[in-house]
Amino acid sequence: MLQPKRRKYRKEQKGRNTGVATRGNAVSFGEYGLKAIGRGRLTARQIEAARRAMTRHIKRGGRIWIRIFPDKPISQKPAEVRMGNGKGNPEYYVAEIQPGKMLYEMDGVSEELAREAFRLAAAKLPLKTTFMVRQLGA
């Protein structure tokens, strides 16, 4: 699963996920892309589950790019622990997703195969997504 190799600080504040994606919002590497319409967080496990679903569907043909990386640590306190005594330990990492962010890209397969693979991947994700085709000159 994806996670940072090392961080300057182990824990991070919650913050707010606002605005729309102004970078990473176009199909750059492949021919087809899966773009987020909704806003939210994707855990490293969700990103990996969607990648596996796509990889299994396209079998050996084609290439997949993951355009997001889970770099925000989410901390949790253990079950049945009283409040106070500091912040909990980092449990998992998430990628914060704004509307318009390109999540995955694919190349080397037909459009029908790419659509179906992205449909299977989108079922694993808690966001609304849409299928994108690379624009000429982009």
From Swiss-Prot:
GO terms for molecular function: rRNA binding; structural constituent of ribosome; tRNA binding. InterPro entries: Ribosomal_uL16 (IPR047873), Ribosomal_uL16_bact-type (IPR000114), Ribosomal_uL16_CS (IPR020798), Ribosomal_uL16_dom (IPR016180), Ribosomal_uL16_sf (IPR036920). Disulfide bonds: none annotated. Keywords: Ribonucleoprotein, Ribosomal protein, RNA-binding, rRNA-binding, tRNA-binding. GO terms for biological process: translation. It comes from the Bacteria. Residues 1-22 are annotated as: Disordered. Residues 1-13 have a biased composition (Basic residues). One of its GO terms (cellular component) is cytosolic large ribosomal subunit. PANTHER family: 50S/60S RIBOSOMAL PROTEIN L16, LARGE RIBOSOMAL SUBUNIT PROTEIN UL16M. Part of the 50S ribosomal subunit. Belongs to the universal ribosomal protein uL16 family. Binds 23S rRNA and is also seen to make contacts with the A and possibly P site tRNAs. NCBIfam families: rplP_bact. This is Large ribosomal subunit protein uL16. It comes from Paraburkholderia phymatum (strain DSM 17167 / CIP 108236 / LMG 21445 / STM815) (Burkholderia phymatum).
